[in-house]
Amino acid sequence: MFSKINTILDTIDAYVWGIPLIVLILSVGLFLTIRLKGVQFTNLGRAFKYIFKDETDGKHGEVSSFAALCTALSATIGTGNIVGVATAIVSGGPGALFWMWLAALVGTATKYAECLLAVKFRQVDEDGHVVGGPFNYIEHGMGPKWKWLAKIFAFFGIGVGLLGIGTFTQVNGISSAVNNFFDPNNAWTVSLFGRTYSWTVVISCLILTFCVALVLIGGIQRISKVAQVIVPFMAATYFLAGILIILFNITDVPAAILTIVQSAFGLKAAAGGALGAMVVAMQKGIARGIFSNEAGLGSAPIAAAAARTNEPVRQGLVSMTGTFIDTIIICSITGIAIVLTGAYDMGLEGVAVTTKAFQLGLPFPDGVASFILMFMPRILCITTILGWDYYSERCLEYLTNGKKKCIKAYRWVYILCVFIGPYMTVSAVWTIADIFNGLMAIPNLIALVALNGVVAKETKDYLDRIKKKEID
């Protein structure tokens, strides 16, 4: 039964993440990069400066720009960086990392544009809360006649949160990491749903579900407070561990980079299979890249809309740093560590690949690396779960016109999905996530192209004011 389901999911995934969507994502990012004159490169320094400098006259919004960024990062830095990169490299080869980089470089412009539009077209609901996202700028930017497209986005946004990035993949990654550390041989097992699971999976799942339920009651303010504390510390810790692997194996780094580039273009495959290898690397790299940094997916704009700012461009600049931090820095460290240690070619899958890379790359006992890869996903994935509950709730709020009973009921359904996440197969979990990601991205990408003139005008006006020293 499970094999049939996996076959069906793989077929759907192949259609959703075929060449057309890959071309669309890269084309929109490249188009916006050219249209905005490389804003993600020319203003990257200013963007990082804005992260820690609150806008003094920002009156609209619920959280600071830094908190909004941390909320967005809390939903991106997690399983995608630790497990997603490993999955992409195992299934698509080392070249998948190259396509993740390329998608991130042009995707930074995409992230900038979508977060700018989120602030530009955000609304205030009947309770006085600021809400916004692709559904808002599709309806209010493109016009009421496009409301059907906004509803499609919101529907798939709920799917991504409930069945994709938000729950199944995160909890699956957490439980696998905990089980690999405490009970790698599955010595303590229990039968559930017709299958056998380790008790560590069941217990960790119960604890995680309880913790998530406690935080979700507090809404965006509590989520952002948790994210502001956890995300910077965990990201820095993981970054340090990855840098140590690279430094301890610095002589192998050039060969690893060469392998990544050659594999990206199928140069290591037989002549007849070069194109096929390249396409697979592109598909897996871009799909996992979108999963990780969410550029173009339309999720980050929902968090950006809550930022206390009067300047859409400013928040767009702050938000675009999330893609740079997530993929260019954190995913790169994971990917390079996996390639230079050869962990991707050892018959492992999921978090076990990254764990093996850390064990081989760090001059510490294997238990230390296992603990790092057990502890890090557990914390980072919790913040991803929290962030995606907020995103998907806003999507449901849009579809139901803010009916509170629906939101409260959905919250418990979301918590239930967190609970059942570990009992899904790894391959099925990631395939479901990929499918919903692709379907969610399409309406948002259409809107970004349609509203590119608004983004360009806002950007030009803001940068002109900087030149005139009206703002800094």
Set out the residue ranges of the language-model regions.
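Flexible loop linkers connecting adjacent transmembrane helices
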Residues: 38-65, 87-89, 93-97, 101, ...
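Helix-loop-helix module between adjacent transmembrane segments
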Residues: 32-33, 74, 103-128, 135, ...
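Membrane-interface alpha-helices at helix entry/exit sites of multi-pass transporters
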Residues: 57-62, 93-102, 140-152, 186-194, ...
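Alpha-helical membrane segments and immediately flanking helix-loop junctions
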Residues: 58-91, 117-141, 152-155, 159, ...
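N-terminal alpha-helical transmembrane segments of multi-pass membrane transport
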Residues: 1-79, 89-96, 107, 419, ...
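Membrane-interface loop-to-helix entry segments
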Residues: 24-31, 36-48, 171-178, 199-261, ...
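Transmembrane helix-loop junctions in multi-pass membrane proteins
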Residues: 4-5, 35-40, 80-85, 161-174, ...
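Extracellular/periplasmic helix-exit of transmembrane alpha-helices
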Residues: 33, 114-122, 126, 243-259, ...
